[in-house]
Amino acid sequence: MYKDRDVNQRDSRFENQQDGFKKNSNFRFFKRKSCKFCDSGKHPDYKEFDFLKKFITEQGKILPKRITGTSAKHQRRLALEIKRARYMALLPFVKK
């Protein structure tokens, strides 16, 4: 039914797939960061600008939730409070 050459080609393709799986086996799973606000029960506040500085890069950009580990609800609130603190001149818009 199958020629010998066809069977060998299929085996070589299967071996290549196994090599591909071995490459992906080095993938590491990271522990999900917990939200600092959910754990402590605190809410972000624009008056606590020293605490808000932890969520801003050196250029003054707001860090995303995948880096900070905050929940979606608190990330939205955090962005709002950072923008309020910027407007009140407690935090800089852009760092020089």
Curated annotation (Swiss-Prot):
GO terms for biological process: translation. The keyword ATP-binding does not apply. It holds the Pfam family Ribosomal_S18. GO terms for cellular component: cytosolic small ribosomal subunit. Part of the 30S ribosomal subunit. Forms a tight heterodimer with protein bS6. This is Small ribosomal subunit protein bS18. PANTHER family: 30S RIBOSOMAL PROTEIN S18, SMALL RIBOSOMAL SUBUNIT PROTEIN BS18M. Transmembrane segments: none annotated. Belongs to the bacterial ribosomal protein bS18 family. Keywords: Ribonucleoprotein, Ribosomal protein, RNA-binding, rRNA-binding. It comes from the Bacteria. The keyword Ribosomal protein applies. GO terms for molecular function: small ribosomal subunit rRNA binding; structural constituent of ribosome. Binds as a heterodimer with protein bS6 to the central domain of the 16S rRNA, where it helps stabilize the platform of the 30S subunit. InterPro entries: Ribosomal_bS18, Ribosomal_bS18_CS, Ribosomal_bS18_sf.
